[in-house]
Curated annotation (Swiss-Prot):
The keyword Oxidoreductase applies. Gene3D superfamilies: Aldehyde Dehydrogenase, Chain A, domain 1 (3.40.605.10), Aldehyde Dehydrogenase, Chain A, domain 2 (3.40.309.10). Belongs to the aldehyde dehydrogenase family. AstD subfamily. Its EC number is 1.2.1.71. Keywords: Arginine metabolism, NAD, Oxidoreductase. It catalyses: N-succinyl-L-glutamate 5-semialdehyde + NAD(+) + H2O = N-succinyl-L-glutamate + NADH + 2 H(+). Pathway: Amino-acid degradation; L-arginine degradation via AST pathway; L-glutamate and succinate from L-arginine: step 4/5. GO terms for biological process: arginine catabolic process to glutamate; arginine catabolic process to succinate. InterPro entries: Ald_DH/histidinol_DH, Ald_DH_C, Ald_DH_CS_CYS, Ald_DH_CS_GLU, Ald_DH_N, Aldehyde_DH_dom, SuccinylGlu_semiald_DH_AstD. It comes from the Bacteria. This is N-succinylglutamate 5-semialdehyde dehydrogenase. It comes from Shigella flexneri. The active site is at E243, C277. NCBIfam families: arg_catab_astD (TIGR03240), PRK09457.1 (NF006992).
């Protein structure tokens, strides 16, 4: 029984699904998808649970959320192993994901008070008040790269605000989704407040098509995000928060310490086997001898990166991709770019058939026209040379995406120029692209999405503002508008 609906674990009535470790092939999870009727059942349960959950005080809802945080802490080792085995990422990185889940809860609670709590301003004849109210029933779509942390960034703020939820994890990480849901169950969530439906495309389409849905919170690919946007078009009554991908540029301008710059670039491009929406996809490198030396060092160090199993000792920097198919898609993208005229500096290699262990790839595309503006979701970096910083900024902005942009340079003036001209939601200076502050907005513009699905700014789209003018008594104004006469003679 792998669906959790209205407080009960039930068996899915849809297609059967088996999840294997992407490196070893070990069977980790088996179950059945939720069919359309079960998705509707989950929605009815969430709708029935909404009034009571929304009417609880914030303090009462907060108790449940904080209990969940405690369960994450006490089950950290077990959840770390589940995430690592299911995604293929090394144990050390899965542990950082669980830590991030725990830390985001305190941030979410503070954010609710600061951004969407209650405010009151006294007026001569009363007061002006601002309150926030939950939307109702929300669908949360989770991604596979951070199957615990990223859905958590939607679920926790939504629950604090008083919403009820239908959660669909990625079909590639059903085990992680179920494991997190069992912790919510232990935390004492009332039946129907949070419901789990497993499944792929058909389940997702049934969920997003629900008429009795007040909103949808999505993290995933741009293609799926666009489909959801089209599906919900013409329904302004539904909140739609999309966090999608990026074709992120990293500008290497002047390099004082080549090793430090190479380290930053590898952290930006290849951590999580390149499976972060924040990863650098385009390396913009200043022409010249210094750029040549940097690139040679980057290739040499990247060549020594060997992906390994989640529990290898010593731990590898990167593990496998989410599936062999995902790894093969990266290889195919490299082959296509090479056929277009790209110069391969480091060829990505699948270490063993039947696994997802893929070595990093680097290809130079300077002077090649018609390069697709697409996110290749894996350890693969494309390189372009530039001559002037103005040219670098134009190249950085030459994308339909707008999530992340980074600059390596000792010159503050160039960073200030980039801040003024960059089309990106996050712009870093001498910091990896894969680093972001939890207390800052996270998200982008253009094809990278809307809203800001971090714990801090997620509060904004998990509740709607209600403004009020209030007075505890009704009195006739001392001064009336022209044309109004309440004299005794007129009244009689």
């Amino acid at each position: 029984m792998t669906l959790w609906i209205n407080g009960d674990w039930i068996t899915g009535q849809g297609a059967s699904r088996v999840k294997r470790n992407p490196v070893s092939g070990e069977v980790l999870w088996q179950g059945n998808d939720a069919d359309a009727a079960q998705v509707e059942q989950a929605c009815r349960a969430a709708r029935a649970a909404f009034p009571r959950w929304a009417r609880l005080s914030l303090a009462e809802r907060q108790v449940v959320v904080e209990r969940f945080a405690g369960l994450l802490e006490s089950n950290k080792a077990e959840l770390t192993a589940i995430i690592a085995r299911e995604t293929g990422k090394p144990r050390w990185e899965a542990a950082t994901e669980v830590t991030a889940m725990i830390n985001k809860i305190a941030i979410s609670i503070k954010a609710y008070h600061v951004r969407t709590g209650e405010q009151r301003s006294e007026m001569p004849d009363g007061a002006a008040s601002l309150r926030h109210r939950p939307h109702g029933v929300l669908a949360v779509f989770g991604p596979y790269n951070f199957p615990g942390h990223l859905p958590n960034g939607h679920i926790v703020p939504a629950l604090l605000a008083g919403n009820t939820i239908i959660f669909k994890p990625s079909e590639l990480t059903p085990w992680s989704g179920e494991a997190v849901m069992r912790l919510w169950q232990q935390a004492g969530l009332p039946p129907g407040v949070l419901n789990l439906v497993q499944g792929g495309r058909e389940t997702g389409q049934a969920l997003s098509a629900l008429e009795d849905l007040d909103g949808l919170l999505f993290t995933g690919s741009a293609n799926t995000g666009y489909q959801l946007h089209r599906q919900l078009s013409g329904q302004p009554e539904k909140i739609l928060a999309l966090e999608m991908g990026g074709n992120n540029p990293l500008i290497i301008d002047e390099v004082a310490d080549i090793d430090a710059a190479v380290h930053l670039t590898i952290q930006s491009a290849f951590v999580t086997a390149g499976q972060r929406c924040t990863c650098a996809r385009r390396l913009l490198l200043k022409s010249g001898a210094q750029g040549d030396a940097f690139l040679a060092s980057l290739v040499a160090v990247s060549q020594r990166l060997t992906p390994g199993n989640w529990d290898d000792e010593p731990q590898p920097f990167i593990g496998g991709l989410i599936s062999e198919q995902a790894a093969q898609q990266v290889v195919t993208a490299w082959q296509q770019l090479e056929a277009m005229g790209g110069r391969t500096l480091l060829a990505p290699r699948l270490l063993q058939a039947g696994t997802s262990l893929l070595t990093p790839g680097i290809i130079e595309m300077t002077g090649v026209g018609g390069v697709p503006d697409e996110e290749v979701f894996g350890p693969f970096l494309r390189v372009w040379r530039y001559d002037t910083f103005d040219e670098a900024i134009r190249m950085a902005n030459n994308t339909r995406f707008g999530l992340f942009c980074g600059l390596v340079s000792p010159e503050r003036e160039k960073f200030d120029q980039l801040l003024l001209e960059a089309r990106a939601g996050i712009v870093n200076w001498n910091k990896p692209l894969t680093g972001a502050a939890s207390t800052a907005p996270f998200g982008g513009i253009g094809a990278s999405g809307n809203h800001r699905p971090s714990a801090w700014y997620a509060a904004d789209y998990c509740a709607w503002p209600m403004a009020s003018l209030e007075s505890d008594s009704l009195t006739l104004p001392a001064t009336l508008n022209p044309g109004l006469d309440f004299s005794d003679e007129v009244v009689r």
